[in-house]
UniProtKB/Swiss-Prot annotation:
Assembly information from the UniProt record: Homodimer.
Any GO BP: glycolytic process
Residues reported to bind substrate: 164, 173, 302, 329, 381-384, 405
Protein name per the record: Enolase 2
Subcellular location: Cytoplasm
Entry GO MF terms: magnesium ion binding; phosphopyruvate hydratase activity
Top-rank taxon: Eukaryota
Source organism of the structure: Zea mays (Maize)
PROSITE patterns xref list: ENOLASE
Cofactor(s) essential for the protein: Mg(2+)
Family: Belongs to the enolase family.
Reactions performed catalytically: (2R)-2-phosphoglycerate = phosphoenolpyruvate + H2O
Length: 446
């Protein structure tokens, strides 16, 4: 007799920013128990599936009792008796039948909330792995039809700007990627050493308070020039002795400083009542990136333009997409329909995989498979408001995305994922493969 779902229980817990989020427990007939919690983002794309919040004054409108109630009274009862190893069936049932809301980009989860559906989807996935008595990453690989497991290159967000920090820096994340490491364990060593060198470089140059950390564990020194951020990384990498082995990635989150009115990007957007002297066109911004790429070892640029600026995305991908990965986050929101459009229009060449943008494991797998078949890279990602849940570590290995960004090597909700990857590498032993320099295409498409 196959194990079935006996009960599903949701509760409100808190993310790393002190905002409410949803956690779900799934109990099965064979005694299996699984628990999952969902994260939430600060710079959210307008095309993301609906994250259901309560509104009102409690928790400044960010309560999730409606989403919790939707799990406890609608989703949970409907899943009793179902087989938790049948991930696709359960996800499709929740998304298409129990919720059923659609917009031009597909299933939008507006009735029950992507946070409610995803929490259940993640917990069911963990339960399915337990029932099959296989590790979660292997269960995910089986669901996707992926035959080769690969440990991802970590992209550590060590300098924060944009909506994540109180400094004047327009661009949101400056990351280091230890592509020259031979294993994930060695990548952690390189990343951690560069991080500590960076801390002392920043402290010396900007003072002790510049080493306070942001939401994702990175530093937020009060610099305004984006180039200064790159310079700090270059210096820290040199001091650690990893020049050529540790490279640089950026997440610009340009939608945050784009003005639809005059179609410009304001690199001084955090200065109130600024004179507009740093507003530039999409073409000028593209040239800023090109100059960065020629001067620094940059291998990845995420969200270089606004989420609706398909034109400049395509231009940039055509011009420097061979040497640099152009990653769509707000542009794609892990949505298979938007991914298909971007593949057709050659808008970018890599997917940022955030399970809570789309709201189910099945749709996430679909977006990844489409991306890989198009020859794209895939980077698994956390959100700025995280929990101690480590699902995305197993997801990155199971789907062999080749890359993961889950913050700096600082703050427990970030390290939880990196530590899980260390455990997975150890468990795989001799068959463990680290993506390294092949992070953009670590496996053949599956």
């Amino acid at each position: 007799m196959a194990a079935t779902i006996q009960s599903v229980k949701a509760r409100q817990i808190f993310d790393s920013r002190g905002n409410p989020t949803v956690e779900v427990d799934v109990f099965c007939s064979d005694g299996t128990f699984a628990r999952a919690a969902v994260p939430s983002g600060a710079s959210t794309g307008v095309y993301e599936a609906l994250e259901l919040r309560d509104g009102g004054s409690y928790y400044l409108g960010k309560g999730v009792s409606k989403a919790v109630n939707n799990v406890n009274s609608v989703i949970g009862p409907a899943l009793i008796g179902k087989d938790p190893t049948a991930q696709t069936e359960i996800d499709n049932f929740m998304v298409q039948q129990l919720d059923g809301t659609k917009n031009e980009w597909g299933w939008c989860k507006q009735k029950l909330g992507a946070n409610a559906i995803l929490a259940v989807s993640l917990a069911v996935c963990k339960a399915g792995a337990s029932i099959k008595r296989i590790p979660l990453y292997q269960h995910i690989a089986n669901l996707a039809g992926n035959k080769q497991l690969v440990l991802p290159v970590p992209a550590f967000n060590v300098i924060n700007g944009g909506s994540h920090a109180g400094n004047k820096l327009a661009m949101q994340e400056f990351m280091i990627l230890p592509t020259g490491a031979a294993s994930f364990k060695e990548a952690m060593k390189m990343g951690v050493e560069v991080y500590h060198h960076l801390k002392s470089v920043i402290k010396k140059k900007y003072g002790q308070d510049a080493t306070n950390v942001g939401d994702e564990g990175g530093f937020a020194p009060n610099i305004q020039e984006n180039k200064e951020g790159l310079e700090l990384l270059k210096t820290a990498i040199e001091k650690a002795g990893y020049t050529g082995k540790v490279v640089i990635g950026m997440d610009v989150a340009a939608s945050e400083f784009y003005s639809d009115k005059d179609q410009t990007y304001d690199l001084n957007f955090k200065e109130e009542n600024n004179d507009g002297s740093q507003k530039i066109s999409g073409d000028s911004l593209k040239n800023v990136y090109k100059s960065f790429v020629s001067e620094y070892p940059i291998v990845s640029i995420e969200d270089p333009f606004d989420q609706d600026d398909w034109v400049h995305y395509a231009k940039m991908t055509e011009e420097i997409g061979e040497q640099v990965q152009i990653v769509g986050d707000d542009l794609l929101v892990t949505n298979p329909t938007r991914v298909a459009k971007a593949i057709k229009e050659k808008s970018c060449n890599a997917l940022l995989l955030k399970v809570n943008q789309i709201g189910s494991v099945t749709e996430s797998i679909e977006a990844v498979k489409m991306s890989k078949r198009a020859g794209w890279g895939v980077m698994t990602s956390h959100r700025s408001g995280e929990t101690e849940d480590t699902f995305i570590a197993d997801l990155a290995v199971g789907l062999s995305t080749g890359q993961i960004k889950t913050g700096a090597p600082c703050r427990s909700e970030r390290l939880a994922k990196y530590n899980q990857l260390l455990r997975i590498e150890e468990e795989l032993g001799a068959i463990a493969v680290y993506a390294g320099a092949k992070f953009r295409a670590p496996v053949e498409p599956y």
